[in-house]
């Protein structure tokens, strides 16, 4: 069995590539970073340190190779593999779709009918379904029947934390023991691959939003609040009592949306929040706030980790003040090395805060949602001082 993994970063190597290799796949990584590509091809293996609650261990990931995403030979690889996975970030999916489209066309022209399943592992709800729509837009209509018959696009939810830690070995990664990979079993074409610890669900939306509204929401709010106070790591931010209360309360607010929407058991969900907090506090998984907070425009989109639960609270007439504080903190974020942060700051300066919120978050003009964010923005420094 062969798999092509787009993205050789932390999640790509530390979670997806590792899991696929342990499941018996030969894994080909595709990335635009030629240094990483060369390192993988030179070593043909890499090491991952797993941080557990009781003990740590290091595992050797073998059967790996790599190709640059711009290499024209990648279409041949796409036509021959059994599985494609991605971990490139939601904004890069459209570029990946163009590459996948060329591979599918090559597969069709060579009359290959072996089913191909594609799992986009991104922090975007139904990212594989989104990827499919982009591929269909680029694929000639005469090939659409082939795609619908032989190409599966499987939506999923992934949950794990892999911090960026400087190592002498560029390929070495430190990961947490906890991991979750849940997929929609109904979207596979052909035989369902046997992948270690992969779980199947017929109600994937609930799991996707549970992770997005809890891990991702809490992570982002802790980062943006912590950066206002010049903290460096997630542990530093969570150790601040005022920030801790806001983050925990925001996760409970987003949790109330989930409980209402999906009929989750309240006590079970509060236990899930507690587990997330313990993961944030793990000193062996120290993660930099600048990494967590990067790409604020993406994180402030209507369907992402901050605005979606916030709007859910309005939808069900539930508390939202701490979610609003987290969103306000995101508009404070400024990092001269982050292009999205620069664009965000420039928009606030030129267009004003209200217009920027309306545009980026896709919120109604003169709405309670917008004014609640502005209110918290004007108070945020006093609140966490």
Swiss-Prot record:
Classification via InterPro entries: 6-PGluconate_DH-like_C_sf, 6PGD_dom2, Mannitol_1_phos_5_DH, Mannitol_DH, Mannitol_DH_C, Mannitol_DH_N, NAD(P)-bd_dom_sf
Keyword NAD: yes
SUPFAM superfamilies with a match to the protein in the record: 6-phosphogluconate dehydrogenase C-terminal domain-like, NAD(P)-binding Rossmann-fold domains
GO molecular function, one term: mannitol-1-phosphate 5-dehydrogenase activity
Family stated for the protein in its record: Belongs to the mannitol dehydrogenase family.
NCBIfam families linked: PRK02318.1-2 (NF002646), PRK02318.2-2 (NF002650), PRK02318.2-5 (NF002652)
Protein name: Mannitol-1-phosphate 5-dehydrogenase
Origin species: Buchnera aphidicola subsp. Acyrthosiphon pisum (strain Tuc7)
Gene name for this UniProt entry: mtlD
């Amino acid at each position: 069995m062969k798999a092509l993994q787009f993205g050789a970063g932390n999640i790509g190597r530390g979670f997806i590539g590792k899991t696929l290799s342990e499941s018996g796949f030969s894994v080909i990584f595709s990335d635009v970073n030629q240094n990483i590509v060369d390192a993988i091809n030179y070593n043909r293996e890499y090491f991952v340190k797993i941080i557990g609650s009781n003990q740590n261990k290091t595992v050797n990931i073998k059967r790996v190779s790599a190709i640059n995403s711009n290499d024209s030979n990648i279409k041949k690889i796409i036509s021959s593999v059994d599985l494609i996975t991605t971990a490139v970030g939601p904004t890069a999916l459209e570029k990946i779709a163009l590459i996948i489209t060329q591979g599918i066309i090559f597969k069709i022209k060579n009359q290959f009918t072996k089913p191909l399943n594609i799992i986009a592992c991104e922090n975007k709800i139904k990212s594989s379904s989104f990827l499919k729509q982009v591929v269909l837009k680029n694929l000639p209509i005469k090939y659409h029947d082939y795609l619908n018959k032989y190409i599966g696009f499987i939506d999923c939810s992934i949950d794990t934390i892999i911090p960026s830690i400087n190592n002498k070995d560029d390929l070495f990664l430190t990961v947490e023991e906890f991991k979750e990979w849940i997929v929609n079993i109904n979207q596979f074409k052909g035989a369902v691959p046997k992948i270690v610890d992969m779980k199947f669900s017929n109600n994937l939306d609930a799991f996707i939003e549970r992770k997005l509204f809890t891990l991702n929401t809490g992570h982002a709010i802790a980062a943006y609040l912590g950066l206002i106070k010049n903290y460096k790591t997630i542990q530093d931010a969570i150790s601040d009592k005022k920030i801790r209360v806001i983050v925990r309360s925001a996760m409970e607010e987003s949790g109330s949306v989930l409980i209402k929407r999906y009929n989750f058991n309240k006590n079970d969900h509060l236990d899930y929040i507690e587990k997330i907090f313990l993961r944030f506090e793990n000193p062996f998984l120290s993660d930099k706030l600048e990494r967590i907070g990067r790409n604020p425009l993406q994180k402030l989109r209507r369907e992402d980790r901050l605005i979606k639960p916030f709007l859910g609270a309005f939808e069900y007439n539930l508390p939202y003040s701490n979610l609003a504080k987290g969103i306000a903190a995101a508009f404070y974020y400024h990092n001269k090395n982050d292009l999205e942060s620069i664009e965000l700051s420039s928009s606030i300066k030129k267009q004003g805060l209200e217009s920027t919120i309306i545009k980026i978050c896709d919120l109604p003009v003169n709405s309670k949602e917008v004014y609640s964010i502005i209110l918290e923005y004007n108070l945020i420094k006093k609140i966490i001082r």
